[in-house]
Amino acid sequence: MESAKYTILVVDDEELMRYLVVSYLSKLGHSCLTAIDGVDALDKIKRNKIDAVITDIRLPKMDGITLISEISRQYPGLPVMVMTAFDEEYSERTAISVGAQEFLKKPFTLDEFAARLNKMINDAEVLKRMKSEKPADENLQELMNELEKTLKNS
């Protein structure tokens, strides 16, 4: 049996949405964990090796923006995608500014979801590899910093 591609944490207080996302990700070969709020999500991240997080904005106990901020602070480099029906430009700007790499508004197509998730995870892996390799000189370090800013803002 082939091992899962990635372990993805799906955070949403709506059971149906969690079920649909997990079912789709499982068909793509990913392993999934779920959480119903930000507090539960941080606990799952602490206890498991998570490759990516997909979260809603509106969550009980700890909202998605606070969750993203905490992930960025405690687990830098862990990619986060927001998927929400909460349609305000403020939410997208805020989520990206606190550390989300992708912002997907519901409803969305499965193809769009998969493409953006794969891009986000691949970008995070490239950045991680680049950071783990010792830069040959300061120019390369500056280039890496610029690439990180570009990836964060794309």
Which residues fall in each region the model found?
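Alpha4 helix (beta4-alpha4-beta5 surface) of REC/receiver domains from two-component response regulators
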Residues: 66, 87-102, 115
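Receiver (REC) domain active-site loop signature in two-component systems and cognate sites
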Residues: 59
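Acidic catalytic/metal-coordinating carboxylates
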Residues: 37-40, 63-66
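Two-component/phosphorelay signaling modules centered on CheY-like receiver
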Residues: 15-33
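A Lys-centered signature of the CheY-like receiver
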Residues: 106
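CheY-like receiver
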Residues: 122-154
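Active-site T/S-Asp motif of two-component receiver
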Residues: 55-56
